[in-house]
Design a protein with these regions (language model features):
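Intrinsically disordered, low-complexity activation-like regions
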Residues: 1-63, 69, 73, 93-110, ...
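Beta-propeller domains
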Residues: 87-92
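Structural helix-adjacent loops and short alpha-helical linkers that scaffold large soluble proteins
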Residues: 78-85, 144-146
Length: 302
């Protein structure tokens, strides 16, 4: 993590003050790494909306950029005000490190069409890191950081989502004609949750920052996140039992078709088994996909 910050500092020395390697080692030590990563998983996200599954997280193999963003997010929302202040001072450097990471830049400027199936773990983690650092920086007290995220970083993330076909990612684990494959499910589910989070960021920017939509509703050909009902998706044994049970129900359509069904005169309601597994997170994704304005939401609440 220190190397990530050191590398980006050497490219932008004019932006920040002196880089004190001893100070960084004091902050990124063995004790704080464990504490703040635990804080991320326990206090900053709900299980159903996690884009990084705790049971699959491995400190030894996770990329430094994703580890850095998880660490800073955990520190920023942990109980220690001192740690929060220390983390805040490093957020801009972390943002530059994530978005200037060569792996992420290759995805941004990729000239060849790709599918989400072709993404490797390092590439997925670079996208996860980008989503997380945007989430942190949207709440930055500094106007320049919020503006940079709005006009530069989020559009880059949208470009990656389109270039890698995250907008079309499907998870066919519920299809009885497709053999159950735990590894494929986890990869697809991670990509689906990433795209769901990117969609919700678009909704946030429309509602609170008055920006135009980056996507059209017809682009949202991705499945909704799975309803895990408190099980550990990372455990292959419990997952297979859960998946077999879930196959008794129909899954909702991809988001773009789901929105069409929701707004049609033939909408059967939530009593239909096809929609019985929706949770709060998936409903937020559906509303986000509609590109709501404050006026639209107000009309829904009347």
């Amino acid at each position: 993590m220190i190397d990530c910050l050191s590398e980006v500092y050497s490219s932008h020395e004019n932006i920040w003050g002196p880089f004190d390697i001893d100070l960084e080692r004091g902050f990124f030590n063995e004790e704080t790494v464990g504490e703040f990563i635990d804080a991320y998983f326990e206090h900053t996200v709900r299980p159903r909306s996690r884009i990084v599954l705790k049971s699959l997280f491995n400190l030894e193999t996770t990329s430094a950029h994703l580890l850095l963003t998880i660490f800073l997010l955990g520190a920023n929302f942990g109980p220690s005000e001192g740690a929060k202040s220390q983390a805040t001072r490093r957020l801009d450097m972390a943002e530059y490190a994530v978005f200037e990471n060569p792996t992420f830049l290759q995805l941004v400027y990729n000239q060849q069409p790709r599918t989400s199936d072709s993404l490797n773990q390092t590439e997925i983690e670079s996208i996860q890191a980008a989503v997380l650092i945007i989430l942190i920086q949207l709440a930055s007290p500094k106007a320049d950081a919020r503006r940079r995220v709005r006009i530069q970083r989020y559009p880059a993330l949208v470009s990656v989502a389109r270039a890698t076909s995250l907008t079309q990612v499907r998870n066919r684990w519920h299809d009885p004609t497709v053999p159950l494959n735990h590894a494929n499910f986890l990869k697809n589910e991670t990509c689906i949750r990433l795209m769901a989070s990117i969609t919700m960021l678009d909704c946030h920017n429309i509602m609170f920052l008055n920006t135009p939509p980056q996507f059209t509703v017809t682009e949202f050909g991705f499945d909704l996140p799975a309803e895990e009902k408190g099980i550990d998706l990372g455990d292959s044994a419990t997952w297979e039992i859960w998946a077999q049970n879930e196959r008794e129900y129909q899954r909702p359509s991809p988001l773009n078709r789901f929105i069409q069904e929701l707004l049609s005169d033939d909408w059967p309601g939530l009593e239909d088994p096809k929609y019985s597994n929706l949770n709060v997170f998936t409903l937020f994704v559906v509303v986000s996909g509609k590109h709501p304005t404050p006026q639209f939401l107000a009309s829904m609440l009347k």
